Amino acid sequence: MKSSVEKLSATRTKLTIEVPFEELKPEFDKAYATLAQQVNMPGFRKGKVPAKILEARLGRGVVLDQVINEMLPSRYSQAVEENDVKALGQPEIEIAELEDGKHITFTAEVDVRPEIEVPDFSAISVEVAPLKADDEAIDAELKNLQARFGTLKPADRAVKKGDFVSIDLSATIDGETVDEATTEGLSHEVGNDSLIEGLDDALVGMKEGEESTFTSKLVAGEHADEEAEVTVKLGSVKERELPELDDDFAQLASEFDTLDELKESLKGQVEQQLKNTQAGEIRDKVLAEALEQTEFELPEGVVKEQVDAQIQQIIQQFGGDEKVFESMLAAQDMTREKFEEDARSSAEDSVRTQLFLDAVADKEQPEVSQEELMDHIAFTANQYGMDPNQFIMQLQQAGQLGSLFADVRRGKALALNIARTSVKDTDGADVDPKEYFGDVEAEGDKADKAETDKAEEKPKKAPAKKSTTKKSTAKKSTAKKSTAKKSTAKKSTAKKSTTKKATKSTAKKSTAKKTTAKKAAEKKED
């Protein structure tokens, strides 16, 4: 086999591949075997029809088509590897020449990674918010904990903010009932504005058994963002009775004996949360600055695929009905063109970030251990509420394990470079990025999760260790996840809070074009 490469642009390459017939015996054997299974001929068992008889029956062209389809993926992959082509997505393939008995020549155009010059991260300086665990933040955490241990008691009075109510809801548009907006016995905390605009205002002042009607936009379903007449009927009213904030409460809600000890632990948790936030801010600002200093073209096929994926994902949310999608856009006074423009902007940002992080990883060449990969898989599985083992099986079936490996590799490479930057807070104090992202010289740095969830359990007496966590990607708005928000910081060593669960808690429980030309290769080349 012979192959050559022609650079069409910074992000597009054309391969020309010539395969002599003497190399195609395995493909011919497989083609004959496949076709023999599809033909029934008197005097021959199924699958045992000789090659010459098959050609006489089906025609030489059918056999050659089968051979070409068998040959294209492997020969294309071989040419990509031999020529060190950094291909993205599937190629567009055309048969350029076919001389039966001599050779087959085909071309493959494919998007490729552009050449990217990674900037000097040691020259990057960013400014972030300072760490201030003030009394107000600590009191807010204490009140949240107190609310979790509150009890609900019936209130024989008009509704006020902070009450918990049971309500029936119904809605009409132009006199027609909206079935999907009808519900009974719905529990709701008045004042949290979690349901529909105008509901809390309507509820305040109502008494049990009363009804009120107001106008609001529906927030979901087929009539999302449409104006509707909403009727709410109040079933019951309950108020939350909070426990006294004293030593007894500390013993009830935590492992501590005194309220002062509990407050000290909560202070540590607030500081931990602030550190997590600061680590995420450092990462985002450093990455944004590095991208600002780097210019490169984007492969159009990759961008287009992400745009199409975003649109198809949203349409699927409406049951695959494109008319409903169009109605949703109309209700928001948005045209299809404007939506696609916004989707393209998002896709370009995603592709630009991923390609840049790939370039950083190629430059740093960080090693990814099995433990690091498994940690990342477990974290991602948790984000989807899945069992890690089940998640791994799905990844293997979809051939996506390599994608998560690449995520960890990008994260480690970026973490190493963030550690080289200069960081100050807005008060002028130096911030050491190594505290979050590890030492530049330490190849064993962990690239794990960002932004640890708030502690939901009982605080331990041991103070929380310093956070080294980082931000996670979770956008689901696109079919292909952006790696812009992948983890880059060291694995958190902060101990989990062990706050007791309240038994009477009142807390409310979118890579490349898939258009292949004639007899295109069906294997994707990453």
UniProtKB/Swiss-Prot annotation:
Q: Which domain of life is it from?
A: Bacteria
Reactions catalysed, as given in the entry: [protein]-peptidylproline (omega=180) = [protein]-peptidylproline (omega=0)
Location (main, coarse): cytoplasm
Q: Is Chaperone set as a keyword in this record? A: yes
Skewed-composition ranges (Basic and acidic residues):
425-460
Q: Does the keyword Cell division apply?
A: yes
Q: Please provide the Gene Ontology terms (biological process) for this protein.
A: 'de novo' cotranslational protein folding; cell division; chaperone-mediated protein folding; protein transport; protein unfolding
Renumbered to this chain, the Basic residues biased-composition regions fall at 461-517
InterPro entries per the UniProt record, alphabetical: PPIase_dom_sf, PPIase_FKBP_dom, Trig_fac, Trigger_fac_C, Trigger_fac_C_sf, Trigger_fac_ribosome-bd_bac, Trigger_fac_ribosome-bd_sf, Trigger_fact/SurA_dom_sf
What domain comment accompanies this record?
A: Consists of 3 domains; the N-terminus binds the ribosome, the middle domain has PPIase activity, while the C-terminus has intrinsic chaperone activity on its own.
Family indicated by similarity: Belongs to the FKBP-type PPIase family. Tig subfamily.
- The name under which this protein is listed is Trigger factor
